[in-house]
């Protein structure tokens, strides 16, 4: 399957795994937002610390605005291969197009590490 048009760079599997781990930890010890509408609001309000987006979302238009909006607000984001994994990490039994960490809780160190790696990828 070809990469969706909104995925502008490749994210290493290690970074994807760390992002999902951080999301699970933040879900249990901090606060997260699930779903494209909630994540969009969190980005616009500047409260999102890390945004995680599924690459296999259809139609693409559902999440196509997330990377540009995140760049505009200088919020790091990571793409993961499957929205089913993202849903599971978010505490859902179904897939989830996007999730955001709003309060990292005990995942702060992981979020900081992911942010540094994201900055290096963007450079």
UniProtKB/Swiss-Prot annotation:
Cross-referenced InterPro entries: eL8/uL1-like, Ribosomal_eL30-like_sf, Ribosomal_eL8-like_CS, Ribosomal_eL8/eL30/eS12/Gad45, Ribosomal_eL8/Nhp2, Ribosomal_eL8_arc
One GO term describing the cellular component: cytoplasm
Signal peptide boundaries: none
Entry keyword set: Cytoplasm, Ribonucleoprotein, Ribosomal protein, RNA-binding, rRNA-binding, tRNA processing
One BP term from GO: ribosome biogenesis
Keyword rRNA-binding: yes
Record localization: Cytoplasm
Molecular functions per Gene Ontology: ribonuclease P activity; rRNA binding; structural constituent of ribosome
Alphabetical list of NCBIfam families matching this protein: eL8_ribo
Self-association and partners: Part of the 50S ribosomal subunit. Probably part of the RNase P complex.
Biological role stated in the UniProt entry: Multifunctional RNA-binding protein that recognizes the K-turn motif in ribosomal RNA, the RNA component of RNase P, box H/ACA, box C/D and box C'/D' sRNAs.
PANTHER family noted in UniProt: RIBOSOMAL PROTEIN L7AE FAMILY MEMBER
Family, similarity comment: Belongs to the eukaryotic ribosomal protein eL8 family.
Protein name, per record: Large ribosomal subunit protein eL8
